[in-house]
Amino acid sequence: MSFVPGQENAGSRSSSGNRAGNGILKKTTWADQTERGNRGRRNHPKQTATTQPNAGSVVPHYSWFSGITQFQKGKEFQFAQGQGVPIASGIPASEQKGYWYRHNRRSFKTPDGQHKQLLPRWYFYYLGTGPHAGAEYGDDIEGVVWVASQQADTKTTADVVERDPSSHEAIPTRFAPGTVLPQGFYVEGSGRSAPASRSGSRSQSRGPNNRARSSSNQRQPASAVKPDMAEEIAALVLAKLGKDAGQPKQVTKQSAKEVRQKILTKPRQKRTPNKQCPVQQCFGKRGPNQNFGGSEMLKLGTSDPQFPILAELAPTPSAFFFGSKLELVKKNSGGADEPTKDVYELQYSGAIRFDSTLPGFETIMKVLTENLNAYQDQAGSVDLVSPKPPRRGRRQAQEKKDEVDNVSVAKPKSLVQRNVSRELTPEDRSLLAQILDDGVVPDGLEDDSNV
């Protein structure tokens, strides 16, 4: 009597047509349907455990269980004594013996052109089956780790049939309680085979006609995700992160300008202000109709650390439409030289209600107090976002410079001359007449009142 994993009290149900003369299952590739897809094509030599290339993607035999993948380099794959045999219903403890076989996976090309080898994946085979069916328990074989339960007799082979993929799906790998998984490894795809198994059982219960249609629907296109593809994508992402993670992203004037232009091209109600495009550039200056935002929040926009707690108060789209008073108003279009277009405003008014039981209530009140009508406190100060002066062309700037060079600049007036409008008194005129040799007061010093 041979045992079948996953079936209670199962007899020998193995398919003799899938066995070679030495009792080993036929070699195949990852997908169960590869052999059917290659019908009519040129036959290639089958790979064995000894001829499998180091970078190959071929799994020589079908394991009853999903694999265990290594994700950290330099880690050793080993289990404590009495541990490491996957558990499956229908297999007694005396037959829980076998080995883990290391499968070397293919390499991939990184963005910088280098080839990187994927870390290996391990598969379990019962003693007397798999790529080393003729080996005895404990033989020193490269890429093989022997495991057995305490009750198993390792001197005899396990009375377990080999898996026929047309009849049995792979079982997600599970271990007995207390088993310690080797560090740097994880169990691969615990639910990868379950959907196919359930759909197959449903198709069998529907009858022969539906069964044929169901099998045709399960055919995978050429672009379907392969088991190794997830690891390749993850490795590419990690390689990219490892290359750029230590380099802080620098914001240049050009990049800031691009971000600002991208934001301003959006409709006004879809803009999100930040450091590159402040609040007043997105929504205009603060005033009675737009009265929220202190100096710091106007500069940082949504990047302000206080903004997320305010965002919790923002209404949802449904609350906006169903909890507000809405009014559709038609506005005048642009000037006479602009094309005619209909412009509308959806004007709204509503309220956001909250009480002191709201988490972060005190912080919310503090932030609201600091930012509501903050423009009134800054009315006498310079605008936070002052418009930049228009750039002068090179020729215009040179002409301006020449004008300045050709003008004789008078000395600045003294404080007395700037602040006091003086009138000459008779005493002043007499004093000046004594100073001047000719005794005549210059016209420039005559009393303004006589002009």
Curated annotation (Swiss-Prot):
Gene assigned in the entry: N
Assembly behavior: Homooligomer. Both monomeric and oligomeric forms interact with RNA. Interacts with protein M. Interacts with NSP3; this interaction serves to tether the genome to the newly translated replicase-transcriptase complex at a very early stage of infection.
Claim: Ribonucleoprotein is one of the keywords in the record: yes
Modified residues (Phosphothreonine): 173, 425
GO cellular component: host cell endoplasmic reticulum-Golgi intermediate compartment; host cell Golgi apparatus; ribonucleoprotein complex; viral nucleocapsid
Protein name: Nucleoprotein
Domain (CoV N CTD) ranges: 256-379
GO molecular function, one term: RNA binding
